Each structure stands twice: as C-alpha cells, then as structure tokens.
Amino acid sequence: MAKKLFCIGNGESRKGFDLEKLRPHGKIYGCNALYRDFMPDVLTSVDHGIMHEVYHAGIAQKIPVYFRDWTKVPAMSYESMLMNGVNEVDAKEHLDDILITNDRGDSKEYVMHGSNLSGIITMIKKNGVKEKKNVNNATIKVSWMKEPDYSHSIRDLEPKPGQVTGDFGWSAGPSSGYVAMLKEKPEEMYLIGHDLHSHNNNINNMYKSTKHYTAKENGPTPAVNWIRQWGELFKWYPDTQFVKINIANDGRDKVNMPIDEWSGHKNISYADYSTLDNLFKL
C-alpha cells in the first residue's frame, strides 16, 4: 500500500472535518495555530509571533516543530544581548511592555527574535504615551528551551541543489510540505485546508481575528506565493502524487477549481471531502 501523508492548511474548507479520523492512515503535518484545536505529528511555523506562541504552549516538548531562523543561544549571553547598552532604570520601566517570554527556569539555551530594546525605548521616550500604546508592534520575543526539546530550524534541513540552506523563505504551508517530503518520503500527499484562494472578498483562514492573524474584515491574502511554492514542490518530487482536497470541484469559486498555474504538473490531482471519506472509509 502506498505511503500516505496528510498536510493540513488552515483554510476554512476543512471546518467541521474531523482530522483525528486521518491518524490511522498516515502522518499528519500542520502549520501555525492548528495546534490550538488539533495536535498534528509535526508542526511548522515561520513568523516570529506564532513560533514563540507555539513554543510557549509547550508543543515542542510533545512533537517535532520546525521554525524559521530558530537559533539557540547559550543562556549566559542573554542579559548582554537583551540589554545591549540600555541602562537598568530604563529597562525596568519599559521591559514588561516589550518582552514576551516564557519562564527561564534552569534553561541552558534560548531563542530571541524581534526589535532592538534600545531602539524601542528611544522610540517610546521620543513619542511618549501614543507610542507606548503601540509597542506590541515592536516587541522582543524570547523562548527558553525546555526538555525534551523537539524544536528545529528549517535552515538546518537538507538544501536542494544550488541552495545554501533548507529554508527557501517559503510560507508556512508549503514549508510544512517540504519538511514532510524530506522526513517521510510519502508516495501520496493529501493537501487538506490549503484553499489558496477565498470564497468571498474576505480573508479565508480558520484563525482569522485571533492572535497573530489578520482581522476577518481584511481582504484575501494573495495566493501567488503559495501557488508558486507548492508548484516547486510538485516539480522536485515527481514520483509523489499530490491530491488537493476541496469541498467540491465544480468551479463554483476559485477555491473549488483547478489551479491554472499547476496545469503542467502531472502529479497533482483534485478530490472532494466525500471522495476522501470513501477512500479511507472515514
């Protein structure tokens, strides 16, 4: 029997579908806030806010997670890297508004992303209360490594020929697909919730208007990068059959029709959720 894998996106087409039913049939890879509702076998995130949210939630102590530029630094360097010339009085006054972190405990390593503390404090001092209200847009995010630690940097993945690292700057969904191909080498990959487009004039995401996500009133995210990145993956792995799962395949909207840019790839096909149910007797 062909080795199957399920790659879960966060498009609204999967709303109401029980992902747990897939578990007996293959590994489940997901991205970003999927963990809030369902624990995949592996999770990938590429944006600072959601990466640190995932780590602070303890997910990396349960399953492998892959993050962008996830560089672990010895704990002894923390104070000097954080303060970087800022005086103690200023740090104490503003740090609580700026720093997002988990508990340090006895951690021996940490990962830090975000703005420069000195720069943020200078900005607050210059613009006063108005700027202090907006410091959430300029924060420092720190994750202290906890054991067991199953977090990895996407950069450390095997690069393709001509590439220096395993991170191509892709979005989270296609990045999770690449991680899955390297780690599992499936013969069939089912793309569930990778809607790419929207059913209407608003953003299509299960987690819209929640922390680290765009407001529900915003317009759709342009699909051009997702389409190009998945297309690259199809080209790199011609012996794997990719199946995009839609609610229907009747052309009622952009979500439920073939992707024109993928028409030259022979290893991508389309199916609906009822076909998926029948195929795996879900």
Where are these regions (language model features)?
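Metal-ion/cofactor- or nucleotide/acyl-coenzyme-handling active-site neighborhoods
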Residues: M1-L282
